[in-house]
């Protein structure tokens, strides 16, 4: 049985059909990235998977007992509110100290445990959100534009950490990204979504798809060059 299986999913918001006839499977241990233009339904699909939105049609089948960790697109905290990373990790319910330490270590922010959240850099804050998602040792880790606002080095470091988490936990990773070079470097499969799934497959197969090229305004040479350039660098950039 697949870790996650979605079939014939339709979801409307405010009378507007946002997702139509979406089919998707996800296996344990793989990294899958969803790409698409703004308003294409990417975040809506993630919210339907975590149960925050209810589809009008179709089904979402999850492996029995599956645990999901979710890193949101953004989390706004009052900068004037004193809060350490350790305290944030204990909200909304307290966790044993050893669980918090393990999650912070997996996310690469052990040294920030006593830091004020307001003093963290953008990359450090995203890693803290990742640590919160890892507290439950998830079978499926979902990331919604988790590198938004980070520079190139920050993105590379963050996704290197995701690769390590995948290997340590054996979890599946489902992420949304607008960064095509991240998609080609970090993913086992890519899904192009624009209300419906336009194309899906390995990065190389998607890069050769007319639907993918049309979606991002790429010609054949640009799309394949994007794949080959970043795929050839992946073993260096994603290594410890």
From Swiss-Prot:
Keyword Disulfide bond among record annotations: no
SUPFAM superfamilies the record matches: P-loop containing nucleoside triphosphate hydrolases
Keywords associated with the record: ATP-binding, Cell inner membrane, Cell membrane, Ion transport, Membrane, Nucleotide-binding, Translocase, Transport, Zinc, Zinc transport
Gene3D superfamilies listed in its UniProt record: P-loop containing nucleotide triphosphate hydrolases
EC class name: translocase
Residues annotated as signal peptide: none
Keyword Nuclease: no
Coiled coil: none
Gene Ontology cellular-component annotations: plasma membrane
Gene Ontology MF annotations: ABC-type zinc transporter activity; ATP binding; ATP hydrolysis activity
Topological type in the membrane: Peripheral membrane protein
Reactions performed catalytically: Zn(2+)(out) + ATP(in) + H2O(in) = Zn(2+)(in) + ADP(in) + phosphate(in) + H(+)(in)
One GO term of the biological process aspect: response to zinc ion
Annotated ranges, domain ABC transporter: 1-219
Residues holding ATP: 36-43
Subcellular location: Cell inner membrane
EC number, UniProt record: 7.2.2.20
Quaternary structure annotation from Swiss-Prot or TrEMBL: The complex is composed of two ATP-binding proteins (ZnuC), two transmembrane proteins (ZnuB) and a solute-binding protein (ZnuA).
Entry similarity comment: Belongs to the ABC transporter superfamily. Zinc importer (TC 3.A.1.15.5) family.
Entry function: Part of the ABC transporter complex ZnuABC involved in zinc import. Responsible for energy coupling to the transport system.
Name used for this protein in its record: Zinc import ATP-binding protein ZnuC
Organism name: Chromohalobacter salexigens (strain ATCC BAA-138 / DSM 3043 / CIP 106854 / NCIMB 13768 / 1H11)
Organism ancestry: Bacteria, Pseudomonadati, Pseudomonadota, Gammaproteobacteria, Oceanospirillales
């Amino acid at each position: 049985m697949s870790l996650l299986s979605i079939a014939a999913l339709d979801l409307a918001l405010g009378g507007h059909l946002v997702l139509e006839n979406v089919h998707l499977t996800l296996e344990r241990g793989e990294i899958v990235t969803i790409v698409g233009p703004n308003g294409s339904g990417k975040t809506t699909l993630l919210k339907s998977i975590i149960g925050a939105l209810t589809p009008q049609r179709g089904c979402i089948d999850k492996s029995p007992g599956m645990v999901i960790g979710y890193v949101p697109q953004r989390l706004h905290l009052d900068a004037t509110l004193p809060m350490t990373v350790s305290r944030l990790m204990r909200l909304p319910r307290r966790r044993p100290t050893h669980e918090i330490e393990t999650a912070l270590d997996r996310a690469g922010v052990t040294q920030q445990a006593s830091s004020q959240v307001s003093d963290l850099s953008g990359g450090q804050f995203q890693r803290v959100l990742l640590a919160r998602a890892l507290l439950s040792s998830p079978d499926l880790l979902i990331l919604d534009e988790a590198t938004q606002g980070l520079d190139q080095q920050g993105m590379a470091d963050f996704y290197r950490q995701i690769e390590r988490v995948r290997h340590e936990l054996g979890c599946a990773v489902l992420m949304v990204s607008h960064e095509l070079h991240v998609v080609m470097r970090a993913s086992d499969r890519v899904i192009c979504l624009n209300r419906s799934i336009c194309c899906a497959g390995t990065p190389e197969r998607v890069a050769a798809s007319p639907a993918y090229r049309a979606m991002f305004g790429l010609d054949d040479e640009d799309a394949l060059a994007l794949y080959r350039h970043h795929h050839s660098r992946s073993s260096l950039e994603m290594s410890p």
